[in-house]
């Protein structure tokens, strides 16, 4: 096996180098502390329901609508066919997942997790809608309507919508200083999952009238958002859009961003206090050096009034992200499908042009030697030397040809032999792999859901089944966490996590 080039402490100067380069192989102090923390906090074998009373901004038990979970698990009002639950094998997961969505419901939108993430996040909401579909179709549509109601005039749909104030998250509305959305929002976006969810809800809808009405209303907003991507992030018409902030990628501290982020010169920042570290062990979160740069970019964009042309030209971080581009391409396929269902033939041709261009452009991101797709740094023009779980997402996008798909399946099989649970977010043989640190190693249910969808589309059903069963086992054994250690299975990050719950429902109750 060819070892990828590693960002070692000696190849990166100064303090930053030592903080970006990790030493999971020997196990540094951070890593050991995090493992001890994870095993102390992991929920033991029986999956638990979230506590109903909550500090943390959670609604009081008395404010919750009365819930008869057993009855709901039995009468599935969306009509989705229970997949493997005839034996009741997954009834505890179903029950807990539904309860999590209800407890994280803030009225038309779902927060990802109490305390840690108290607002509406973009791709979280789009994926969570798929979970809501198994409880309440109307509520599933509302999730998407609420997200798209925050759309900016230029078409962008922001990465966070600040519906109500919260002291538990930083940086909040006062730092972003954007007034475009009625309730305030960030000034960047996230991977555009929404059109994919609209198609799925539309296809599985029982209430066809509601589905047609809502999809027809949402369609122009989705089209405007996709147009924004090409105007704002691909002004040269390459077929691949740029990502200007690691938060836009959704895979915030991916090793793929290390070198590009290291080149962002840190501004003189006002003093700040990270609230995430009050909720989660610091060894499971991005490092300070990364946060300083995240904030530097936020202030840079704010000072440019979030003007889309200025941002593209002045951002000191600009990459071609596989996750965003795979999701955008898949979303275009689904948007085109929707255009045909609702009689928007006028949009069909425009979307077809995007699809054709991207289909070809994706080949420039395939690394035949590594047998995986890679991101590109747009400021250096170089392919980024990091194999991450995003490298499998071209399967979800359907842009891989059959030989590329076979190579990806083989790569995935090699990765699975190195860890107990797949899919790790970074190649487990890479020295940058850290099994508990957020997007640098842990398993994420949402990524697994997209990878399994892609594997099945290319006929790798058995491999898809393995990844799906790994995820359900993780949840069953450890709880519905934000992410999981691929080596030990320990749950990490936030607990009672909405999109993990939603993916379980989407898998177990899939139509
Ligand atoms: O760490 C954070 O504060 C936020 C910033 O957007 O990102 C994480 O959390 C968000 C909420 O779950 C996700 O959408 C992102 O992909 C990421 O996992």
Residue ranges of model-derived segments:
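Low-acidity, Ser/Thr- and Arg-rich intrinsically disordered low-complexity segments
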Residues: 5-11, 18-26, 35, 39-41, ...
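Extended, well-ordered alpha-helical scaffold segments
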Residues: 89-97, 136-149, 208-229, 331, ...
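Alpha-helical support elements that line or immediately flank enzyme active sites
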Residues: 125-155, 390-401, 448-461, 468
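Extended glycan-interaction surfaces of carbohydrate-active proteins
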Residues: 80-120, 146-184, 238-320, 357-443, ...
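Bacterial Sec-dependent signal peptides at the C-terminal "C-region" and cleavage site
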Residues: 21-28, 61, 71-74
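Long, repeat-rich segments with strong aromatic
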Residues: 315-342, 442-449, 453-458, 462
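Internal, well-ordered domain-core segments that constitute the primary functional module
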Residues: 193-255
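N-terminal polybasic/positive-inside topogenic patches
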Residues: 39-43, 60, 79
